[in-house]
């Protein structure tokens, strides 16, 4: 006779074990119709799963934009499998999980799928979903599940059972009419919930992400509760495609990638200009916030990486080389090198806090399938810093880091920032006392600045708690960039000490701090955020001066030289082309200011100024325009609408 407690505190008693759907029906048919699944004592369950004991229950409905939507998307992955097996009976199904904003299914199929094939598969999915068939869940023995997949020739499902499922488990098999899939669930009770979906694209993916395994075909899709949400999402995807940093990077001659150097960026003059301006900006912030800039070696002996503990955890991701019977690793991160710098010379508590920053050239052997333009690379530059401080200085130093993070992000126009605080995991180093003190210091630092944050219990690293900063761009996409991570482990492992007030040797607390993260990735984010319309201070070309006829050529050259001498990235366009053609071309290049010179402007010692967005700013005296654009650059104004 289970007693079910609902979110509003009300209780319902039942004579027999009861399912989420039964409870929903007891409340009303409308709720039952909208019921997708349940959350029993905080655990998600299928709507048909029986509750045998007293429990709290939350009914997951179509109004749930988190769990409810994730379940719908997962069920759409099964629906995709159902349609695929009908159209391609020889296809072997691998895995079909949900991802951010959608789902995918990996399949082994001899023929390569095209966009036209996806349209055919989607049409079959819609025809199946239209019938609103019931999804039947059956818990079976391990052997029954394996027999079912062996009879269907599903070798990947058999491998999952053999390697990932205990023989004592009772896997859940979900029956979609004649199609069977295996999953922990939960899933929708019927296909009436899977009506608003689309397939997006197909790509290659190695089985289990291992390049030694067979390359499968991965079909991506997305789904929503209603037609409008799906349409809005597809509109955002179209806009994201227009803003793709790889496409704009080529249009603006910023960078390129090539097969001979996978995951390594070839910066062109225009892109390197943006990169250097970012470095200059961050260097100013480092000075403002009291950092020393250092530079560590690119490569260090394996022995040091073993001492730091990175060899055990990162060896597969490290590029190595050898010389004179010694093995070296190219650094994947800067922190061990910074500890070596700290260790040179005796340090006193009076020397702390010591804030050490580096634009570190790092390399990680990322899987080739994970590489993505300059967003995910193998060679990158970290705007990395490490702060060595006493335990009593933690809160002040973390507060200083947070101020720097927000100060930096606001310059680029990022105001929507989500903050997460990750606390101690079960396996950790350091005393409970230092963890208590550190977690409280991080909380106090955030709360002193009125910053809302979400606590992620147990998600901290084994060596200390951390704060993560996630930016949301103009399309609502999340980019995790900044981190403030405490470390009680590395200084101790690498022998970092300072002399305390009582002449004792103490181990400093180390704070890892990143703001942009990887400069390459952050530039990719900026390209997509601005759609290539960089603020004037970042724009590779800040102004172009154009003549209407040959008569103004010398005047245009004179202005270009004056702007260049004033530190403005300007050039003269003296081509024998119509002025409208020149304006269109430089508009496509996203040059912030286009200066037009005809006879009238030349005689008056003026220039006609228009922006890349087509705004006519009128006529300026040359010196007045120099002051105007210098103010834009010096103040780092966004001026994205100009």
Curated annotation (Swiss-Prot):
GO cellular component: cytosol
Residue numbers binding Zn(2+): 335, 386, 512
Reaction(s) catalysed (UniProt annotation): tRNA(Thr) + L-threonine + ATP = L-threonyl-tRNA(Thr) + AMP + diphosphate + H(+)
Keyword Metal-binding: yes
Domain TGS, residue spans: 1-61
Enzyme nomenclature, EC number: 6.1.1.3
Catalytic: region residues: 244-535
Gene Ontology BP annotations: threonyl-tRNA aminoacylation
Subcellular location, principal: cytoplasm
Compartment(s) of residence: Cytoplasm
Manner of cofactor binding, per the entry note: Binds 1 zinc ion per subunit.
Cofactor(s) named in the record: Zn(2+)
GO MF entries: ATP binding; metal ion binding; threonine-tRNA ligase activity; tRNA binding
Keywords (A to Z) from UniProt: Aminoacyl-tRNA synthetase, ATP-binding, Cytoplasm, Ligase, Metal-binding, Nucleotide-binding, Protein biosynthesis, RNA-binding, tRNA-binding, Zinc
Family per record: Belongs to the class-II aminoacyl-tRNA synthetase family.
Cross-referenced HAMAP family: Thr_tRNA_synth
Function comment: Catalyzes the attachment of threonine to tRNA(Thr) in a two-step reaction: L-threonine is first activated by ATP to form Thr-AMP and then transferred to the acceptor end of tRNA(Thr). Also edits incorrectly charged L-seryl-tRNA(Thr).
Subunit and partners: Homodimer.
Name of the protein in its database record: Threonine--tRNA ligase
Lineage: Bacteria, Pseudomonadati, Pseudomonadota, Gammaproteobacteria, Vibrionales
Record gene name: thrS
């Amino acid at each position: 006779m289970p007693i079910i407690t609902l979110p509003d505190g009300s209780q319902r008693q039942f004579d027999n074990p009861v399912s989420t759907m039964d409870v929903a029906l007891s409340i009303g048919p409308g709720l039952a119709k909208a019921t997708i699944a349940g959350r029993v004592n905080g655990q998600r369950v299928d709507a048909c799963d029986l509750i045998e004991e007293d429990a709290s229950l939350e009914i997951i409905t179509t109004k749930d934009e988190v769990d409810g939507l994730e379940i719908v998307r997962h069920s759409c992955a099964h629906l995709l499998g159902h349609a695929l097996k009908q159209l391609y009976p020889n296809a072997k199904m691998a895995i079909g999980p949900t991802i951010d904003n959608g789902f995918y299914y990996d399949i082994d199929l001899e023929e390569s799928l095209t966009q036209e094939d996806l349209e055919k598969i989607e049409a079959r999915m819609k025809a199946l979903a239209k019938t609103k068939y019931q999804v039947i869940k059956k818990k079976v023995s391990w052997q029954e599940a394996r027999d079912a997949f062996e009879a269907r020739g599903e070798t990947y499902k058999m491998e999952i059972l053999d390697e990932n499922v205990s023989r004592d488990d009772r896997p859940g098999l979900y029956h979609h009419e004649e199609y069977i899939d295996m999953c922990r669930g939960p899933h929708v009770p019927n296909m009436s919930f899977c009506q608003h979906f689309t397939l997006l694209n197909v790509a290659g993916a190695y089985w289990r992400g291992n390049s030694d395994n067979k390359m499968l075909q991965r079909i991506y899709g997305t789904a929503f509760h209603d037609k409008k949400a799906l349409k809005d999402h597809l509109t955002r995807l179209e806009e994201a495609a227009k803003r793709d940093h790889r496409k704009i990077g080529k249009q603006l001659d910023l960078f390129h990638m090539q097969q001979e150097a996978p995951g390594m960026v070839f910066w062109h003059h225009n892109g390197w200009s943006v990169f250097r301006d970012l470095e200059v900006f961050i260097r100013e912030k480092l000075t403002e916030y009291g950092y020393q800039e250092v530079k560590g070696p690119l490569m260090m002996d394996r022995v040091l990486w073993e001492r730091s503990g990175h060899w055990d955890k990162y060896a597969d991701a490290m590029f190595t080389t050898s010389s004179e019977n010694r093995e070296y690793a190219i650094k994947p991160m800067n922190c061990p090198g910074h500890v070596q710098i700290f260790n040179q010379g005796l340090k006193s508590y009076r020397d702390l806090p010591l804030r050490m920053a580096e634009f570190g050239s790092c390399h990680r052997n990322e899987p080739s399938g994970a590489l993505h333009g300059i967003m995910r690379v193998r060679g990158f530059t970290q705007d990395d810093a490490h702060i060595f401080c006493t335990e009593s200085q933690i809160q002040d130093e973390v507060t200083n880091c947070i101020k720097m993070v927000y100060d930096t992000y606001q310059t680029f126009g990022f105001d929507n920032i989500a903050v997460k605080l990750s606390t101690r995991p079960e396996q950790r180093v350091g005393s409970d006392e230092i963890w208590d003190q550190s977690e409280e210091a991080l909380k106090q630092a955030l709360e002193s600045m009125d910053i809302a944050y979400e606590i992620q219990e147990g998600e901290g690293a084994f060596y200390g708690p951390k704060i993560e900063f996630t930016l949301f761009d103009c399309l609502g996409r999340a980019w995790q960039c900044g981190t403030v991570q405490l470390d009680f482990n590395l200084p101790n492992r690498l022998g970092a000490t300072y002399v305390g007030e009582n002449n004792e040797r103490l181990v400093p607390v180390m704070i890892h701090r990143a703001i942009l993260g990887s400069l390459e990735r952050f530039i990719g984010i900026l390209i997509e955020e601005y759609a290539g319309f960089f603020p004037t201070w970042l724009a590779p070309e800040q102004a172009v001066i154009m003549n209407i006829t040959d008569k103004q050529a010398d005047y245009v050259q004179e202005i270009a030289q004056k702007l260049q001498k004033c530190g403005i990235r300007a050039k003269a366009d003296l081509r024998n082309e119509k002025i409208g053609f020149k304006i269109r071309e430089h508009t496509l290049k996203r040059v912030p200011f286009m200066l037009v010179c005809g006879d009238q402007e030349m005689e008056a010692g003026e220039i006609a100024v228009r922006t890349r967005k087509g705004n006519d700013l009128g006529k300026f005296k040359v010196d007045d325009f120099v002051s105007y654009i210098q103010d834009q650059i010096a103040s780092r104004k966004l001026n994205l609408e100009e």
